[in-house]
Regions:
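Ribonuclease/tRNase effector modules and their secretory precursors
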Residues: 1-85
């Protein structure tokens, strides 16, 4: 399960990332260790649309999450970084 705290949801909205995109990035894409037992996940999406008045071909999400749940199999989203290009 992926848990979206209010802070993460606010940052996602500000940065143009949907829950669906974050879920895909966490479950299906490249991961890398981060500090303090967190993990980072990264995925490049075909975008082909405007964001804040500028057209971009691609969008890259970097998701930082901490393990959660009783058995550590859940992910609690810490923050999401979006990069458009």
């Amino acid at each position: 399960m992926i848990v979206f705290p209010e802070h993460a949801l606010e940052r996602m909205e500000e940065r143009g990332a949907s829950r669906q995109e974050v879920r895909r990035t966490v479950w299906e894409e490249e991961s890398f260790p981060d500090r303090q037992d967190r993990m980072g996940f990264r995925f490049e999406f075909e975008f082909g649309a405007e964001w804040n008045g500028t057209y971009y071909e691609k969008k890259e999400l970097t998701v930082y999450a901490a393990p959660g749940g009783e058995d550590g199999s859940d992910w609690i989203i810490v923050t999401v970084i979006s990069r458009f290009y």
